[in-house]
Amino acid sequence: YLIRKLTQNNYKVTVVTRNIHQKSYKIKTQGNAGYIEIVEANIFDEIKIRSLFKKADICINLIGILYEKKRSSFKNIHTLFPSLLAKLSKQNKLKHLIHLSALGVSEATESEYARSKLDGEKEILKNFPLSTILRPSVVYSVDDNFTTNFMTLLNRLPVFPLYYNGQTKFMPIHSSDLVDIIFNIISKNIYSQIIECVGTETL
């Protein structure tokens, strides 16, 4: 959705993926020809990440994890990597950094996941104050199976946090609505904001 929206509005997009052979075809079909560049990179390869910033105007960070695996720890992905992006945004004088965090991270301080997200937000605002941070609720789209994926997640995680004494409610947001928010931030030059993004229904 995001690639399609940006390329339809004449933005040239560099998409960073860790597996270009697996993702290339799907990514290319999401936007206008000539407006998409696909780059394979490991986010732990700081030299490669630095090189990508030399020709960028805007950075949109969508990377996040729900469980840890080897080097993909909450601290590395949610705190240290966003901190690097913010520093590089400042060094290369980017127009904007848009970062996806998560809804409720400032309240759920007992969760390591939430703490890492909140620490990432603090690092971003400290190093590149012009950044806009989005805190979306659960994101879904018509071409995924939200219920099945959610149940799969519950089966895979050793512990699934239910905040507020187990009375957790969700207000899922459709991916196209989240994309519209991101596009409006870019087109309307919205800076230095923390925006909570939710849908219209409570589950």
What is the predicted role of each segment?
Residues T152-I173, D177, I181-V198:
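A conserved pocket-lining segment of Rossmann-fold NAD(P)-dependent short-chain dehydrogenase/reductase
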Residues F44, V105, V139-S141, L178:
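Conserved sequence/active-site signature of Rossmann-fold short-chain dehydrogenase/reductase
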Residues N19-H21, E201:
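Residues in the short beta-alpha loop(s) of Rossmann-like NAD(P)-binding domains
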Residues F44, I77, F170-S176, L203:
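Residue-level signal for the nucleotide or nucleotide-sugar donor/cofactor binding architecture
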Residues Y1-K12:
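N-terminal Rossmann NAD(P)H-binding glycine-rich loop of SDR-like oxidoreductase domains
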Residues S111, T132-L153, T168-K169:
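Flexible, glycine-rich beta-alpha linker
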Residues H21, Y25, Q30-L84, L88-Q91, ...:
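NAD(P)H-binding glycine-rich loop region in Rossmannoid oxidoreductase-like domains
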Residues K12-T14, I65-L66, N76-N127, S131-S137:
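Conserved Rossmann-fold NAD(P)-dependent oxidoreductase catalytic core, especially the SDR/UDP-sugar
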